[in-house]
Amino acid sequence: NQMRFQATITCKTSNIAVDIACNKEETKRMLELASIPVASGGICVDEEDLENVIKKIGYPIVIKPLDGNHGKGASINVKKWEDAVAGLAYAKNYSRRVIVEKFITGYDFRVLIIDNKLVAAAKREPAHVKGDGTHTIQQLIEETNKDPRRGYGHENVLTQIDVDRDTTDLLEKLGYTLETVPRKDEVVYLKSTANLSTGGTSVDVTDMMHPENIFLCERISRVIGLDICGVDIMAENLTQPLKENGGCILEVNAAPGFRMHLAPSEGLPRNVAAPVIDMLYPPGKPSRIPIIAV
């Protein structure tokens, strides 16, 4: 009855399913074959490929490494050729092949599926600060990082906000620098992706999901074959079916993080660890009391 797991990969997790989820091109192909909505786009290795894909789908676009994660190497809402070329070079620091997709407007949602059943859903927001009309962006970042919930890496429920190329690029597009003083109540986004690992926050929306979206996400976990599956969705909301509000699936993640569900910035915390134990040790199955190392 011994069961093993590391992070959110278990002894029941399929190696093939993990390989599929780590390959955005293969994931997208499988979802398209299953008539699941995904963003249009293509794969690039050089500027010629990039130009051809842009001619096909038009601006704005998203550029990201084919086998990347945690938003590393991604450029979002790219609207002109010079920025697209820079985004391609940036993504190629993380992967030889790059995926380019149509930029879809809406909010970033993460849906957690365990054992092919919905467990939790969260709306994610990129790292940001809110202006007070007095302090600079740098000072606001430092103040935000004093939140006791923020730590380094995954040591706490939220992550410190670091200033990197993504941050400076976003500020430059606004005509801002770290020394700019934002207007009172002005929200200044510091990252282009909503990952908690880059300082993002989350709001629980589990109880707001439309039944059709629940069915869709549970089906995705079966299509890819993951026992623990994080489905990333871009949509205006999850209260309507994606086919009605124009939403689509962005990615499917193996080893999805649990922090945003266990301790959301807003909303009801979800005990997402319990379904993992129930999957490994189903109720009623003859076994010893499970001993878990954390």
Question: Where are the language model's segments positioned?
Answer:
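Short, composition-biased local secondary-structure segments
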Residues: 1-5, 20, 183-192
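Oxyanion-binding "anion nests"
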Residues: 140-188
